[in-house]
A protein has these predicted regions:
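A generic structural signal for short
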Residues: 55-57, 79-80, 110-111, 151-152, ...
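Short, solvent-exposed loop/turn segments at secondary-structure boundaries
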Residues: 55-58, 70, 116, 278-279
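Short, conserved glycine- and acidic-residue-centered signature motifs
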Residues: 21, 60, 118-122, 156, ...
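Gly/Ser-rich helix-loop-strand patches that form or flank binding pockets
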Residues: 1-10, 88-140, 252, 256-304
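Structured loop/turn residues at secondary-structure junctions
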Residues: 16, 83, 138, 151-152, ...
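Small/aliphatic-rich secondary-structure junction motif
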Residues: 2-59, 74-76, 145-210, 233-242, ...
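Structural beta-alpha unit
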Residues: 1-6, 20, 30, 36-42, ...
C-alpha cells in the first residue's frame, strides 16, 4: 500500500549571492508558484556569516534580503536569517531545528569574500541533512525535463514517491531510468565454482554457458520489473514517463543520458550516512552531484 507523500510546505533555502544561489532562489519561486493551492508554504532564506567576517554583517545580508524580496513580491512567505559559523554545519543544524520538507542549495558558491557554498558544502549537506536536498546549477532554467532514477531499493522508492508529488511546472517531460550492472550477475554457485579453480584451470567458457545467459536474462527481467513498479508510482499521480533500461556503470550511464537528452533535473535516492561513512568512495549520488551538468534532487533514506 502506498503511503501518501507529505506536501512540501517548509523550505530551507541557502543563499550566498552567487549565480548558483540566485538560480536556486528562482527555482524555489517557480516551485511555489506551481503549488499555488498550498497556502502553508514557508521559505526560510538562510545565509552563513563566516567566523572571520563578523564585521561584514550588512554585506552578507544583502543577497538574503534580495532573495526575500524576490519571493515576497510573488506572494511567497519568506523570511531571511544570517547565522555565523561554518556553512555545512549551520545549514544542517538549522534543518534539524526547522525540520523542513526540502533544502535548496546552489551547487557552487562565490569563490570570493562572500562565498559560503564552496566546493564540498553541498555534498556535506546532502550526506548529513535530515530531508531531501535540491542542488541547483546555474545558469537558471525552468525545470521541464526530469530524469527519475530507480534501482529498486527502498531509498529509490522514496525518491520516486517524492518526485511524483513534487510541484513541477505542468506539462513536464519525464524520463524513468534503471541501469543494469555492467557485467552479468554472478550467483553464489558460479562464484564458488570459479574460486575453487586454480588460475591455470580457469575456463573462460564458464562465463558463456546457458546458465550465465539465464542469469543475464533474469537480470534484465528484474530491471524491467523495477521500471514497471516505478512507473506505476508515477502514473498514480498522472505522470507519464518514458522508460529506459541501460547497462553499465550507474553514475556514468545516468550522467550521459541526462546530457544526451537535455535533462534539467535528475532525481535519485541517497542513503543517509553516518559520520564514519560520510566519505564513502563510489557513491552514485556523490558522482552525480559532482559530475552531472544539471540540477540534482537527492531524496534521503533516513538512518535507522
Amino acid at each position: 500500500m502506498n503511503t501518501p507523500q507529505k506536501p512540501i510546505h517548509q523550505v530551507l533555502l541557502a543563499v550566498d549571492g552567487s549565480e548558483h544561489s540566485l538560480a536556486a532562489v528562482k527555482t524555489v519561486r517557480d516551485m511555489a508558484l506551481a503549488a499555488t493551492h498550498c497556502r502553508e508554504c514557508r521559505v526560510k532564506v538562510l545565509g552563513v556569516l563566516p567566523v572571520s567576517e563578523g564585521s561584514n554583517y550588512a554585506a552578507y545580508m544583502l543577497p538574503l534580503r534580495e532573495a526575500e524580496r524576490l519571493l515576497n513580491e510573488h506572494s511567497i512567505s519568506a523570511t531571511a536569517d544570517l547565522i555565523q559559523g561554518y556553512p555545512a554545519e549551520v545549514i544542517v543544524d538549522q534543518a534539524r531545528v526547522m525540520q523542513p520538507d526540502l533544502i535548496v542549495i546552489g551547487a557552487k558558491g562565490l569563490r570570493a569574500t562572500l562565498g559560503i557554498l564552496l566546493g564540498g558544502v553541498a555534498q556535506q549537506v546532502i550526506e548529513h541533512a535530515c530531508c531531501p536536498v535540491l542542488v541547483i546549477r546555474a545558469p537558471y532554467r525552468r525545470i521541464n525535463r526530469v530524469l527519475v532514477c530507480s534501482d529498486g531499493s527502498v531509498c529509490s522508492r522514496k525518491a520516486i514517491e517524492f518526485a511524483a508529488n513534487f510541484p513541477f511546472i505542468e506539462g513536464g517531460d519525464f524520463h524513468l531510468l534503471h541501469v543494469l550492472p555492467p557485467s552479468p550477475v554472478l550467483t553464489p554457485e558460479l562464484l564458488a565454482r570459479v574460486w575453487t579453480l586454480s588460475d591455470d584451470a580457469l575456463d573462460p567458457t564458464l562465463f558463456t554457458t546457458r546458465e550465465m545467459e539465464a542469469e543475464v536474462e533474469a537480470s534484465r527481467k528484474a530491471g524491467d520489473m523495477i521500471l514497471h513498479e516505478a512507473n506505476e508510482l508515477l502514473l498514480a499521480q498522472n505522470i507519464k514517463a518514458k522508460t529506459m533500461l541501460l547497462q553499465g556503470d550507474a553514475a556514468t550511464e545516468i550522467i550521459q543520458y541526462a546530457s544526451d537528452n537535455a535533462v534539467d533535473l535528475i532525481i535519485a535516492g541517497s542513503r543517509g550516512l553516518s559520520s564514519m561513512q560520510s566519505w564513502l568512495i563510489g557513491s552514485v549520488s556523490r558522482k552525480l552531484v559532482h559530475y552531472a551538468s544539471c540540477s540534482m534532487l537527492l531524496v534521503k533514506q533516513p538512518l535507522a
